[in-house]
Amino acid sequence: SGLIEEDASRQRNILSTIIELNAEKRQKAIPWYYAPTYLLFWLALFFAVVVPLFNYLPTAVRESEESTKPGEFVAERAQKLLLVLDRMGPKIVGDEMNEKTMVDWMLREVDKVRQVMREDLYEIEVDVQRASGAYLHWEMINMYQAVQNVVVKVSTKSSNSSNYLLINSHTDTKPGSVGTGDAAFMVVVMLEVMRQLVISEKTFEHPVVFLFNGAEEQPLQGSHAFISQHKWSANCRALINLDSAGAGGREILFQGGPNHPWLMRHYRESAKHPFATTMAEEIFQAGLIPSDTDFRIFRDFGPVPGLDMAGAYNGYVYHTKYDRFDVISRDSLQNTGENLLSLVRGIGNAPEMYNTEAHSEGHSVFFDFLGLFFVYYVQSTGVALNICFSIAGLVLVCVSLWRMSKVTGLSPGAVTGSFGIMFVMELAGFVLALGLPLLMAVFYDAGDRTLTYFSNSWLVIGLFIIPSLIGLMLPVTLYYTLQTNHKLPHGYNLQLAGHAHCVLLALLCIILTAVGIRTSYLFLISLLFYVGALAINLLCKLHDRGFLWSILFCICQLLPFLYFSYLFHSFLVITIPMTARKGTEVNPDLLISILCALGTILAMGFLAPLINLFRRPKSIIVGLALIMFTFCMISVSDVGFPYRPKTSVMRVNFLQVQRTFYEYDGSISLDDSGYYFDLQDRRLEQPLAETMDISGIVHLEKECETQMMCGVPCFNHRWCEARKAARWLPRAQRVEIPGSTELELLNKTISADGYRVVYNFKLTGPGRMSLFIKPLSGVKMVDWSFLRGMLDKPFTYKPPYHIFFAWAADDAPIEFYLELTKFDGKFNEPVFEIGISGHYLSQLHKRDALSQQFIKDLPDFVHAMEWPASYARYVY
């Protein structure tokens, strides 16, 4: 009985100590008015460190400094060339500007480089490639005729290497865009890099091929022409692809390899201003970014491994008439030029180039830290690191719980029970931190208020980041304030919140690693610094000394906070402009809200619960809610209207269409004109309807049920994919088409067995045409003169078939045949439908007066990518 009394007395003393510690909680807690300072500290850190480093660009080198800075990229010279290209205007494939003027200019500039070349060290070979071909591009056959590339090979005379480094960018532009950023910027950088290579005493072992691709925008034809047909393509062992989704700023490395981590090692060793992340690669390859690059063509048809880099700053001007010289700084040219020149010298001397397949070792995990340095490791190493630190986190949490039990005298089960409750609270906070921003995105979409942040990106702070922060804080704070009888001291309870978040991240890290998602490195970074702080606190016994552990904890969270806020700030800067061209089917606010939520969870997941160090933590949450409400009120005012003239425009793609539907007997069943809109963002035609008369506009759903391809001349695979969401605005006056598109039936031959028929056609028309072919019921396409890929995979490619055709330097008509079979052998009745569209993209093609007036009436916040088009449907 004495032992029982002694044990009871000890339990009473422990309980008394705990109650005393909890009673002293309010006295020891930091005054509430310091809590805003705590939160503002992290905000100030973001603006003081992250934003300047994100915007940092090296000082441009001038031509007058070249003698004192030998071997360095000279941005001033490149900028002068950029101004020349800007003044040339749009360079549309098929126009004289692209096919002759631009080619001649490129040859002159290469000759200027040859004139200053060290002839004792280097030699230059130039080839103007003209090629025709075809390949399967998503859901269409992409055919091209006489596209042109200017190809330059630079070699060191003393080297016998037959392994080439390929550097690619494109010279053509989108209709209506000068394309100074996309991609004249990269073209002039390549020219200056070429110049620096051939005037330097530092030679390189492997020849460098500069591909000035003349047909990227229509789409990706020049790169296919080179890799499938050029005499130097078979020797290309590695690639640096240069493109742009913006104008100015830093270029981001967003794809690498695949399966060639040695390229990342050279990027780490060579790039002076690294900007890269595995997360961007996985997002891009998941199709969340509405773009494609030549990198895919070289990868799939080479295959050539490489690095895919693109300018992504100020994406508002991408593919618009505002992509001009004046929005690109000289310092941004210096940034890209220094990186490219160093990379070319590094890979140009790489021993791996002799046998790249021998160094194919799997995917890489890669990222830069604030642009200061670059980290990469192979995926297998990443798996080991992720598992090790996840397990280390779980083990140290268990050690901490045991330590709490030993110090307080509570049973391990009681401490574990408290941790279990806190884990549930942390899990609820994680769900709320993700769910509240998503809920905001859904509500704004339901109220037709998407894209309110498009021109004023700071609105995402109140719309998505603060709700996520509230979600992180709310469950833990409510638990602490409403539960008065805590078994553990307050300092330990706060540590339990961090432990719960650590366990959650460790579990997520293990799961994502198991399914092969390399972006799990983000959780590794969080775990690394938390595990380090916890280990030091346990060893130094700060773990058991009130709130002293929180000092080291916050210090160790500085670097993760800086990295995660930098990373997700970068993503928001890149992706927000893209939301206005992401299409109408998906709510773009969902993507932005997820990015904001993930950034908040990773940057503040360990830090947010620490508001409970202060008195009245609920008042902080109320204050944040008031700030969120204020932002919401601002967002539904004129400030939240998405578009602004020139700086952040609404993209409107529309065609002035003349349609004619011919029946089997030659009669015309439809002959009309109108404007066909391929809408680009979630707001659809609403902003136009508020500023101009488009009252007759109709949806195409009913047309899609009755007409092949909805009865409209969709341009390429993206237009065709979105055709059911398109709009049609009829007009009474006939659209004047500045040319003709003619389909001529040359011959119809029925086979001897009577069950097959061959139709021979000749097609004449403008630089871009599409054929849509749909066999009727009981009919099957068995052969044609196009690529057989679609016919060989009938379960993947179903009618109507889309064949896209473009010519560049040669407008000769194409002849083709279609071979079909019909189970009943009746070929004197309708067998198939064929639609022919002709697109007149160039600004040299005149728009009729009514179309010009319609374009003029568009609001000033609209950029229209438009052209006349004809569409004729025949039944044979």
Model segments located where?
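Alpha-helical transmembrane segments of integral membrane proteins
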Residues: 5-15, 20, 36-50, 389-717
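Membrane-entry signal-anchor segments at the cytosolic-membrane interface
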Residues: 25-41
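Ser/Thr/Pro/Gly-rich low-complexity linker/stalk segments immediately outside membranes or between
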Residues: 54-73, 643-651
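Soluble extramembrane regions of membrane proteins in the secretory/endomembrane system
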Residues: 61-377, 777-778, 783-821
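Extracytosolic and intramembrane catalytic regions of membrane-associated proteins
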Residues: 104-141, 145-153, 187, 269, ...
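C-terminal domain-closing interface element
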Residues: 234-253, 383-407
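Membrane-proximal extracellular juxtamembrane segment immediately upstream
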Residues: 348-367, 428-443, 841-876
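Cytosolic-side membrane-insertion boundary helix
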Residues: 358-394, 410-419
